[in-house]
Amino acid sequence: EAVKAVMCREYGPPEALKVEDVRPAEMGIDDVRIRTQYAGVNYPDIVITAGRYHWKPTCPFVPGLECSGVAIEIGKAVTHLRKGDRVMASIDPKFITSTGYGSLAEEVVAPASQTFKIPDSMSFRDAAAIPIAYGTSYHALFDRGGLREDEILLVLGAAGGVGLAAID
């Protein structure tokens, strides 16, 4: 059964994107199918759909790097999530490149390694805004920057999502 999704049929401005009926993404044993409640739109989404990102999905594709929703199908190898869990997910651009599917759809298939339970106290709306900003900030500070607990950090340009996440 078809689902609604934003489609990028050719690289260009956001106005070129269209909502269409598409076949649902295929599941792997390490994946989670999510009934989307909210999906974030980030600067890389604009760059990817314009064809200016270092990974270029083959058109047509469904863009989108993050979402929140309810897990409706769990891959056989996934052990940390259950059907019905409230989840948030990050969709790596490499995953979109290999599958053609991102998070701007009614149903999203995400790698279980990038899918996390949402705390009961958090809304779907707030959860959808976390994966990219916080993931990017964490990667920059700890994986790339080697920040340690005893160090002091000055964050410049903290008005955006990644900068605010770094302060947090």
What is each residue range found by the language model?
Residues 114-124, 150-152:
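Glycine/charged-rich beta-loop-alpha catalytic/anionic-binding loops adjacent to active sites
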Residues 44-50:
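Cytochrome P450 core scaffold surrounding the K-helix E-X-X-R motif
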Residues 1-3:
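Eukaryotic N-terminal low-complexity, Ser/Thr- and Lys/Arg-rich leader segments
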Residues 23-41, 52-93, 102, 114:
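Glycine-rich beta-strand-centered segment in the early N-terminal region that forms part
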Residues 96-112:
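A structural motif shared across PLP-dependent enzymes of the aminotransferase-like
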Residues 128-168:
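Mid-domain Rossmann-like dinucleotide-binding core that forms the NAD(H)/NADP(H) cofactor-binding site
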